[in-house]
């Protein structure tokens, strides 16, 4: 459903990569739902931007879209809707909001990429929705960017891993350069050789995801674990 995709070591890495690709940093605001896993918000602090949380609807875990409108300012660069338990967030509603004339007039690009896009970007946390769909569209082809998780507890797993898909102007080469190394303001502990900003999915986990026997064994293991 989309040819623009790259495999990474986690959905967290994918979401952070999006912010780096867009040049998000200090002075920028990223809107996330209050009901979410920590990664959706923590990646915002990784790049030095400001988290703006929007509360859930009264009878639904999705963000309140009236509050979302109120939360958008001239500093807002990205909105991160979160899919939960296989249910896709209403990205179409968010698209309708961010393309309203009064919202478009607020958008203030900070670099050439943001200027080319010309509006707030939707970066969808799809860690829970691999294989899900909404109104005939698959998760991964709805938002500008979609981040997937292949963690051991997900419905498709490589033990550890993730992927990023996108529907914007970026070419594969630009994303793959980010995949190799991504600068971050977070300091590492002196003496450590491990670097969490090497975003590549390991070859072992990649092969696990491509091997039907390995996938079959994983499904059996998940079944036994659930029992």
Predicted features and spans:
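Conserved N-terminal alpha-helix of the aminotransferase class I/II PLP-enzyme fold
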Residues: 1-10, 35
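Active-site region of PLP-dependent enzymes
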Residues: 112, 129-135, 142-212
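Conserved beta-strand elements of the Class I
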Residues: 6, 29-31, 221
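PLP-dependent aminotransferase-like
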Residues: 20-129, 133
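Buried hydrophobic packing segments
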Residues: 14-19, 162
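PAS/LOV and related PAS-like sensory modules
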Residues: 210-227
């Amino acid at each position: 459903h989309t040819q623009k995709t790259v495999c990474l070591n986690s959905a967290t890495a994918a979401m952070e990569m999006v912010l780096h690709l867009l040049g998000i940093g200090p002075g920028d605001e990223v809107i996330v739902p209050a009901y979410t896993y920590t990664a959706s918000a923590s990646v915002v602090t990784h790049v030095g931007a400001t988290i703006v949380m929007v509360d859930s609807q009264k009878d639904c875990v999705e963000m309140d879209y009236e509050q979302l409108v109120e939360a958008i300012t001239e500093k807002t660069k990205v909105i991160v809707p979160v899919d939960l338990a296989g249910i896709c967030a209403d990205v179409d509603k968010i698209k309708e909001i961010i393309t309203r004339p009064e919202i478009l007039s607020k958008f203030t690009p900070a670099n050439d990429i943001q200027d080319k896009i010309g509006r707030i970007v939707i970066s969808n946390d799809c860690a829970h929705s691999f294989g899900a769909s909404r109104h005939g569209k698959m998760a991964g082809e709805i938002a500008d960017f979609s981040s997937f998780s292949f963690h051991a507890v997900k419905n498709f797993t490589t033990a550890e891993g993730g992927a990023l898909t996108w529907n914007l102007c970026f070419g594969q080469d630009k994303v793959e350069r980010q995949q190799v190394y991504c600068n971050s303001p977070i300091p590492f502990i002196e003496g450590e050789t491990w670097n969490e900003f090497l975003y590549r999915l390991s070859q072992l986990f990649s092969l696990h995801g491509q091997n039907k026997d390995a996938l079959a064994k994983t499904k059996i293991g998940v079944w036994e674990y659930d029992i």
